[in-house]
C-alpha cells in the first residue's frame, strides 16, 4: 500500500543522512584547498550539497534537492534539524534511524537536543542575548512559519518562530527570560569543520 507521510519523511531524512555519511567516507581523508572553509570540511568535497547527484528511489538527486523537494514539502521545519550535514555545526546525528511510528517523538528529541546544545542555542541572560545556529537563518520561511499570528513582540516572524521552536526545551528560567523579550537575537557562525 501507499506509505504514510511519516514513513516517507523518515525515509528521506534517513536517505539524506546516509548519503552524507557515504560522501564523507568516499572522500576521506578530506584535504581541501579552498581557503573559504576548513581543510577537513564537507564543503571541500566538490559539489557536496548541490552538485553531486545520488541515485535514490529511482531518481538522481543532489542533497539540496532532497532537502528542498522531498523533505521541505512535508512542512515540518524540525526535519531540517534532523539532517546531519557532516559538520560540527550540524545538529547531532542520531544513533538510530528515523522510523514512521516514532517520528514525532524522534523529531521532538532532535529539537530538545538542538535547543540545549550551546553551539546551537545560547541563552545568555547576563548579556541579554540569544544566539542561535546560523542553520535557522538559512531557511527563514520554514522557521518563521512557527511564529503564529501574535506580532506584538516587535520581533521578526523568524525570531518569533525560533523562540517558539526552542522555548519548550529550555529551563523555566530561560523561558521566563525569553518572555521578557528584552534580548538581542543573533546567530552563531556555522562551524563547517568535519564532525
Segments the model singles out, each with a brief description of its role:
Residues 1-195:
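Interaction/scaffold regions that mediate signaling and macromolecular assembly across diverse proteins
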Amino acid at each position: 500500500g501507499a506509505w504514510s507521510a511519516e514513513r516517507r519523511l523518515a525515509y528521506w531524512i534517513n536517505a539524506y543522512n546516509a548519503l552524507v555519511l557515504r560522501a564523507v567516507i568516499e572522500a576521506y581523508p578530506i584535504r581541501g584547498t579552498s581557503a573559504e572553509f576548513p581543510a577537513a570540511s564537507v564543503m571541500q568535497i566538490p559539489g557536496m550539497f548541490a552538485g553531486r547527484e545520488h541515485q535514490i528511489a529511482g531518481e538522481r538527486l543532489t542533497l539540496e534537492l532532497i532537502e528542498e523537494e522531498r523533505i521541505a514539502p512535508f512542512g515540518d521545519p524540525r526535519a531540517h534539524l534532523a539532517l546531519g550535514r557532516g559538520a560540527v555545526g550540524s545538529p547531532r546525528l542520531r544513533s538510530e534511524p528515523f522510523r514512521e511510528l516514532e517520528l514525532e517523538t524522534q523529531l521532538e528529541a532532535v529539537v530538545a537536543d538542538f535547543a540545549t546544545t550551546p553551539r546551537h542555542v545560547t541563552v545568555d541572560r547576563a548579556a541579554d542575548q540569544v544566539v542561535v545556529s546560523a542553520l535557522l537563518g538559512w531557511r527563514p520561511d520554514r522557521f518563521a512559519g512557527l511564529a503564529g499570528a501574535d506580532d506584538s513582540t516587535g520581533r521578526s516572524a523568524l525570531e518569533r518562530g525560533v523562540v517558539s521552536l526552542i522555548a519548550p526545551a529550555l529551563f523555566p528560567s530561560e523561558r521566563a527570560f525569553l518572555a521578557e523579550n528584552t534580548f538581542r537575537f543573533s546567530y552563531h557562525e556555522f562551524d563547517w569543520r568535519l564532525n
